[in-house]
Design a protein with these regions (language model features):
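PLP-dependent aspartate aminotransferase-fold enzymes
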Residues: 89-148
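Active-site-adjacent loop/helix segments that line or gate small-molecule/cofactor pockets in enzymes
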Residues: 1-29, 77
């Protein structure tokens, strides 16, 4: 398939959530992305600033493969070893003693709203109703996140 075939296929098959650049990524290595024509690009976007791991990092890939061989994902209904190990690393690197892991920024915003309301209720006897946020900023696609 050529570049235009990929673009046409994506336009007809994928929900149009963003205006995309006419660039079809084939693979990445380090901080670079490569298109289907082999052209190299320095990746400044990094998953729109939420996944700045780079590409094809051997240490990261090996750790990911080792974890996938054990367990890739479980529900929050269960306790699991990897999440406790991750929590301990966060505690060691910070002054926190409790952590809330999520799968997305939207879930982080929703969790922050709920935590703030719970805090206000515990402190004042009623849930707070005002949220301070950056104007015209992206907070996620859920109803709660869109309301911020």
């Amino acid at each position: 398939m050529n570049k235009q075939d990929y673009i046409d296929g994506a336009e007809s098959a994928l929900l149009h959530t963003y205006n995309r650049f006419p660039l079809v990524i084939d693979h990445g290595d380090g901080v670079y992305l490569y298109d289907t024509d082999g052209k190299e690009y320095l990746d400044f976007a990094a998953g729109i600033a939420v996944q700045a791991f780079g590409y094809n990092n051997k240490e990261y890939n090996d750790a990911l493969k080792a974890q996938i061989d054990k367990v890739m994902h479980t529900s929050n209904l269960y306790y699991n070893v990897p999440i406790m190990n991750a929590a301990k690393r966060v505690f060691k690197a910070s002054q926190m003693n409790r952590v809330f892991f999520t799968n997305s920024g939207t879930e982080a915003i929703e969790g922050a709203i709920k935590a703030a309301k719970k805090y206000a209720y515990t402190r004042d006897g009623h849930a707070g109703h005002e949220i301070i946020a950056m104007n015209h900023s992206f907070h996620g696609r859920s109803i709660g996140a869109l309301s911020v």
